[in-house]
Structures are given as C-alpha cells and as structure tokens.
C-alpha cells in the first residue's frame, strides 16, 4: 500500500470532522480547525461508492493488513486528505466494479474516513 497527500490547499492543523451523507450517497466532509476557528473546509466527494469510519488510528484499519508491516505509516502531519494506492479495500471492490475507482482517506482528530469513489474530491474553504 502507498499513499499520496493530495489536499495541499488544506493547511495542516488539528481538524474535527463532520460528515453529511445524503440518501443518494453524496458525501461532504466538513473540517473545522480546533485551534484556529477561521480554518474551515468542505471536501465534496460527490456521489460515492463506499465509505467507512476509522476510529483513532491505522491499526484499526483491518482490511489493510500490510499497513503494520509497511515501512511508512501516514500520520496526521503527513496530510489531511490522502489518496491511497494499491489497497486491499480498493482492489476488492475493483474486481466487481467496471469503472476506475479511487480510494481516499481523510484524517481528523476525532476519527478518519475511507472513501471509494469514481471522482476527484473538490475542496472548498468556507
């Protein structure tokens, strides 16, 4: 498994995450900086295929067995929005889904979230 920091426009800090998922599977994640109340962002994933919440830490991401043996663990300071490459989760879904998909992970201070989607997320400062 590899990862790439793609949320460069999101200034690094400690963000609390809030999620809004519609009945049509449209996912928006709102980030609010716990120290600097002026830093607020929305990551709009559009219609997603799958999402799951990760509670406090990579060791609880059970579908990514190779995380524990890999040389490099992404930390909160490595990026808030990451594109995950060659993951077990993405590979399992891709076997049954004909279109190309992307695996993203958003890391917050209260939890993290895995997202599978066909689209690139849109980041808005609010």
Tell where the protein language model's regions lie, with residue ranges.
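Surface-exposed, interaction-prone regions used to assemble/regulate multi-protein complexes
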Residues: 1-126
């Amino acid at each position: 498994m590899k990862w790439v920091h793609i949320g460069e426009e999101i200034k690094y800090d400690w963000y609390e995450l809030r999620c809004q998922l519609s009945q049509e599977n449209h996912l928006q994640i709102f980030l609010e900086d716990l120290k600097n109340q002026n830093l607020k962002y929305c990551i709009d994933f559009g219609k997603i295929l799958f999402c799951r919440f990760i509670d406090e830490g990579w060791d609880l991401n059970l579908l990514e067995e190779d995380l524990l043996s890999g040389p490099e663990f992404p930390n909160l300071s490595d990026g808030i929005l990451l594109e995950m490459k060659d993951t077990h989760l993405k590979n399992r879904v891709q076997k049954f889904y004909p279109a190309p998909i992307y695996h993203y992970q958003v890391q917050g201070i209260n939890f993290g979230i895995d997202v599978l989607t066909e689209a690139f997320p849109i980041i808005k400062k609010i």
